[in-house]
């Protein structure tokens, strides 16, 4: 009854929003049809600025460090996996580590039944990376270095979906979110591998400006996400 004529602005970094926020919006609108909800995507610098100038209520993100200006609530985790061109010779000796498309897409590999691939097997292969400012780029490089080699990066790209399609063309190995596979069709052109490095597991946060008044709409949206508004991460 308190949420009949209010507005709520929820935004996210690109791709995370298209995959996650759409479903949440449907649930929220069904429960609170009177709330006007704006959902946008953008780059992390613009979105952080919007959060701090109060034009954005809640931000779904993976890369803003905790600090004096924001409060973060853990929403979920995502897994980074390898997408390797099927034509690469290295795949022949790694058959026991390969995942089926559905297995990779649905996260069924998270248990112990699927073994992580030995990353050092790819030391001589070309890689497709996201650009340096992207958190996945930093994680990708760290995963390779932790395996004892410096990756041979052929190309730096802006979007993770583009890196998927470039890998599909055979140009190099891409680090992708496993949830991306829910947005594409199965293909024989790629083979998927689990990564054992802790850097491959990434937190997704719902973030708000610290000290800002928590509206009933914001509180309701957080609770819909199974988040306790009074319990931000310290």
Go through each PLM region and give its residues.
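Short helix-loop hinge/linker segments at domain boundaries
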Residues: 1-9, 18, 29-30, 65-73, ...
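N-terminal winged-helix
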Residues: 3-32, 36-49, 213-216
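Short, well-ordered beta-strand segments
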Residues: 7-11, 59, 128, 174, ...
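A late-sequence structural motif
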Residues: 20, 162, 178-180, 190-233
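Short beta-strand-centered segments that line the small-molecule binding cleft or hinge
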Residues: 23-27, 45-100, 191-193
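Hydrophobic hinge/microswitch elements
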Residues: 43-47, 52, 62, 132-190
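Short secondary-structure boundary segments
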Residues: 63-64, 86-87, 177-180, 204
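Secondary-structure junction motif
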Residues: 90-92, 97-147, 214-218, 222
């Amino acid at each position: 009854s308190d949420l009949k004529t209010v507005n709520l602005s929820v935004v996210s970094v690109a791709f995370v929003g298209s995959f996650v926020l759409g479903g949440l919006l449907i649930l929220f609108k069904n429960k609170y049809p009177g709330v006007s909800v704006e959902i946008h995507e953008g780059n992390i610098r613009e979105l952080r600025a919007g959060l701090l100038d109060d034009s954005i209520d809640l931000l779904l993100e993976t890369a803003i460090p905790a600090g004096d200006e924001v409060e973060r609530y853990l929403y979920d985790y995502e897994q980074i996996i390898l997408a390797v061109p099927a034509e690469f010779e290295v795949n022949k000796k790694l058959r026991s580590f390969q995942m089926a498309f559905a297995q990779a897409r649905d996260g069924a590999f998270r248990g112990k039944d699927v073994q992580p691939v030995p990353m050092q097997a790819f030391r001589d292969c070309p890689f497709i990376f996201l650009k340096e400012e992207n958190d996945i780029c930093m994680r990708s490089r760290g995963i390779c270095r932790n395996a004892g080699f410096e990756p041979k990066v052929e190309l730096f790209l802006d979007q993770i979906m583009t890196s998927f399609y470039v890998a599909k063309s055979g140009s190099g190995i891409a680090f992708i979110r496993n949830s991306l596979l829910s947005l594409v069709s199965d293909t024989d052109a790629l083979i998927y591998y689990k990564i054992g490095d802790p850097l491959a597991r990434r937190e997704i946060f719902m973030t708000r400006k610290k000290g800002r008044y928590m509206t009933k709409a914001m509180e309701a949206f957080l609770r819909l996400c199974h988040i306790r508004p009074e319990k931000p991460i310290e």
